[in-house]
Design a protein with these regions (language model features):
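Short internal beta-strands
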Residues: 70-77, 157
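Glycine-rich, aromatic-lined ligand/substrate-binding cores of catalytic
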Residues: 221-299
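Glycine-rich oxoanion-binding loops at beta->alpha junctions
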Residues: 90-119, 131
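Glycine/threonine-rich flexible loop motifs
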Residues: 128-140
Length: 389
């Protein structure tokens, strides 16, 4: 009887959790809250494969509802997700709608005044993962800059943040390191949705000249920062599941090192290591995968290392992975293969130096706290949803 009660409890817990996940709804799904704002206007849409309303793409939904969509802007990986990590995204036309597509991840990272000359309002709808160096945040910031320059409205259709239940990592404090993987004074795991960050960017004067754009955010429904949210569509080619999304804040720092994080395998951002690694029990051989991974580290070489798994959602970045790989790698001088890029990901040059000096994790984290506390005060002003505990 005891086992039956436990089983019933677990079933009930599963049903309640499933209902909560199902009940959450993106800003894009709240069509009654923004269709009226688009009526009789020429609309540009910043979107990718995650931009869905139910099972239909946002662009298709707008067109079938009589909204005049005149063009599409595509972020990293492209409008239909056809480009790999870091690959140049080209201009073109969408085969289904015949609409022109302008790349925001190539020769231009923001719409030009010419591109916006026949546009009244920009709609931004992209799923983010809540990490500073995920480039969709920089794309949104650049679109906001363009909206200021061209005096256009921007509507952000908000989406839940799967990593929005905690805040961690160093705050980006050195403007000299600003790049497309980080150009805001926020921590690596910022605990905000893109809608909240858009309000923060506007409110804190982080756009050029401390100007602000004409911004409307359409919030999600039934979402809190404690909510569990499982992404229905992978946000980018190398983040195929929730394990990779939870590991991403920690493992992406390895992109500035020589360590493989599983790019070119069936478990990207779910395993890491190098040839002849003495730590961990997993093994993998990175290979080129068209549209997903080009020239991955240690291509066609057998790597050994650690496979990532989570019994529960992580509540902080895992610095021990980075420290373990550094201590295990035989040639310390070559570990940080791209030190400048590592610093851009970290937001400062201090973390790299701390790892090299063997500073403890507690000591490293202590150096983050002052800036984190200041950020948390700013963040509270722009929250659209109940916060995590």
């Amino acid at each position: 009887m005891k086992h039956i009660r436990i089983s019933l409890f677990l079933c009930l817990l599963f049903i309640l959790n499933a209902f909560h996940v199902f009940a959450q709804s993106s800003g894009a799904s709240q069509t009654e809250n923004y269709f009226g704002l688009l009526k009789n206007k020429r609309v540009a849409v910043v979107a990718n494969p995650t931009s869905v309303v139910g099972k239909a793409h946002l662009v298709d939904t707008l067109i079938t509802s009589g909204i005049q969509v005149v063009k599409i802007f595509a972020p990293e990986h492209g409008f239909r997700g056809e480009a790999g990590n870091g690959d140049h995204v080209s201009n073109g036309f969408d085969k289904k709608t015949k609409l022109p597509i302008f790349s925001l991840y190539g020769s231009h990272t923001r719409p030009t005044p010419e591109m916006l000359s026949n546009v009244d309002v920009i709609v931004f709808d992209i799923q983010d993962v809540g990490v500073r160096f995920y480039t969709f945040l920089a794309t949104m910031q650049e679109v906001m800059e363009a909206a200021v320059i061209s005096k256009k409205e921007i509507i952000v259709l908000d989406r839940p943040n799967p990593n929005g239940y905690y805040i961690d990592g160093p705050v980006m404090t050195d403007p000299k390191l600003y790049s497309f993987v980080g150009q805001l004074p926020i921590p690596i795991v910022h605990g905000c949705t893109l809608g909240e960050l858009a309000k923060m960017i506007n409110g804190e004067g982080w756009l050029s000249g401390k100007k602000s754009c004409e911004l409307t955010v359409i919030p999600c429904s039934a979402y809190t920062h404690n909510s569990y949210f499982e992404l229905p569509i992978k946000p980018s080619p190398n983040l195929p599941n929730m394990t990779s999304i939870y590991a991403y804040p920690s493992l992406c720092l390895f992109e500035g090192t020589c360590i493989s994080i599983g790019r070119g395998t069936n478990l990207p951002f779910q395993q890491f290591g190098f040839p002849n690694c003495k730590r961990g029990e997993t093994s993998f051989t990175p290979k080129e995968i068209p549209g997903v991974s080009t020239n991955p580290p240690f291509e066609n070489q057998l790597c050994k290392g650690i496979k990532v798994s989570f019994e529960e959602r992580p509540t902080q970045m895992n610095l021990s992975w980075l420290m373990t790989m550094y201590s295990s790698y035989p040639n310390k001088e070559k570990f940080f293969s791209s030190p400048g890029f590592f610093d851009k990901l970290a937001g400062n040059s201090l973390l790299r130096k701390q790892i090299a000096k063997g500073i403890s994790e507690d000591e490293i984290r202590a150096t983050w706290q002052k800036d984190l506390n200041s950020y948390k005060v700013i963040r509270q002003k722009y929250l659209l949803y109940p916060d995590f505990n």
